[in-house]
Amino acid sequence: MAENGAKVIHPRAVELAKNADIILQIKNTYNPTFEGTKIGPASMLKDAYEDSSKTKFMSAVAHRDKIAQVKVIGSEEDFSDILNEMEDRHINMDMINFLTEKKAFALDVSNLDEVENILKQHDVEYEIKPDCAKVTLIGNKVTETPGVIAKIMRALNAENITLLQSSDSYNSLSCLVDEKDMVT
């Protein structure tokens, strides 16, 4: 969740607890009687996990602003060279969508000038949208739950928000939107 922008707990702390078979219990300082969130090996949390998986689909929403969307149209060879240059310069990409005719990805705006310089060196068409935000829904078995993207699209459409790009994993679904549409 932290890597998606949530202000929760450092991933290294989770890793240390996992390696030592320790259950972390995250409490709410404003409501100490609330049970909070337990993080630990699935075998140790089996009962709690099974109960919550039946009742809760989404468990958190995280967000990050200052994201840029980059779309590139060019040959596979050019794009491979671009990726190599980005790797050499330690520029991370996120929300990667590679289609036959175009490639799209998101990145932190702090890397935008450097990426644009790389793109200008190659014979590719590109489009950059700098004022974006990533909203991530974190939940249980996201990719195994039918209709998730349809529900998200209905919610976005109801608020006249354009979905610029999306990506998913087993436990999360991220939506790239205009930064002005993200309300924190």
PLM feature segments, named:
Residues M1-D168, S172-T184:
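C-terminal catalytic "cap/lid" subdomain
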